[in-house]
């Protein structure tokens, strides 16, 4: 269950907000509230809840530029119902980081006027399939998660 807790030091926008460290930076900040709710309902792991700077290798530069352009135009990408499959045989080369960058960018574009609705999901396919399997033998909240998939705008698998 979602519980709102304001912490200005954990604000996603403190580096760009003119109200940070002023008396206007307080628990009633709608931007913080909405973004906090979007992050919570998306299930993005804590380690990915803040955007990380990536530096492309020369062999990945074209892919990096493509993904960066897509991130900059995430609203139109989502509105068009597009899909993207980021894959590699290797670990640690930024696939998950890029996926969460898309979610974070999307959330930063749509928070105003969102009305505290879930708008994106970060799903570990392995964990989802395991939860579905477990649901056959016990009660768990996998159905709540499955019900969200067709409702939100953006799903990262």
Residue ranges and their predicted role:
Residues 81-85, 119-120, 154:
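Residue-level preference for the first positions of well-ordered beta-strands
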Residues 77-78, 113-115, 147-150:
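Conserved catalytic network of the ASCE P-loop NTPase/AAA+ motor domain
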Residues 80-100:
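Walker A/P-loop nucleotide-binding motif
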């Amino acid at each position: 269950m979602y519980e709102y807790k304001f912490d200005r030091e954990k604000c996603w926008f403190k580096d760009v907000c003119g109200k940070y460290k002023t008396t206007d930076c307080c628990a009633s900040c709608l931007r913080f509230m909405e973004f906090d709710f979007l992050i919570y309902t998306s299930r993005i792991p804590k380690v990915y809840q803040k955007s990380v700077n990536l530096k492309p290798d020369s062999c990945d530069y074209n892919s990096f530029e493509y993904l960066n352009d897509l991130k900059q135009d995430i609203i139109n990408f989502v509105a068009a119902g597009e899909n993207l499959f980021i894959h590699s045989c290797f670990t640690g080369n930024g696939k998950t980081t890029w996926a969460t960058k898309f979610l974070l960018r999307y959330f930063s574009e749509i928070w105003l006027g969102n009305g505290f609705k879930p708008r994106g999901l970060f799903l570990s396919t392995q964990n989802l399939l395991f939860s579905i399997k477990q649901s056959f033998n016990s009660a768990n909240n996998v159905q709540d998660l499955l019900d969200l998939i067709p409702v939100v705008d953006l799903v990262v698998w």
